[in-house]
Amino acid sequence: QLSAKDTFTPINDPNKLPKSALELWQGYDARAEDLEVNTIEEWKTDEVTTRYLTYKVGRFKGANSRVSAYYSFPNKPGKYPAFVWSHGGGQRAEKNRSVYFAKQGFANIDINWLGRPVKEDIDTNTDWGKVDPTQGPRFYSKALRKGWKVNLQPDEFSIDPIPSPRNSNWILLSMAGRRAITFLEKQPE
């Protein structure tokens, strides 16, 4: 069931599918939806502040998709260069990595797109809702598929009900990264 607030309207007509990378992202504004940031935990040292948080990637099939992340920044007042760290497959976001980069003078957000448990034993984590760009239950306990989706065919956990480039896992993962940039843009550091 489609909610009026879904990030994308499903495409049912093959003639309306995007035919280029530009068309694929046409009409998508990563700043349009509220990030709905929830700070779960915060740690401070003399040098760095780190927050474990979740933010909204989008709304798909009537359910919100949220990604957890570590956001770290130097405590010294000022504006800092910032970047998104997106871990490799089978890995997870790591607090120590985020702290390391903050100590080097960078604000950074280390996103936990795969949803593997974090080392701090915090229960709140990535929740993709009714879509699933993950690598399956071996890595993500809330996985909706048995494994990594490697095609553009539709299933009950993809965006479009017809073969579509928007059914690629990489669309949702790219959105998670782009929304992390939106998060960084809104920070005072």
Give short role names for the model-derived ranges:
Residues 2-39:
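N-terminal pre-domain segments of enzymes
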Residues 26-78:
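N-terminal cap/lid segment of alpha/beta-hydrolase-fold proteins
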Residues 68-71, 78-88, 108:
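Short beta-strand element of the alpha/beta-hydrolase
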Residues 91-92, 116:
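Active-site loop signature of alpha/beta-hydrolase-fold enzymes
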Residues 188-189:
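Alpha/beta-hydrolase fold nucleophile elbow
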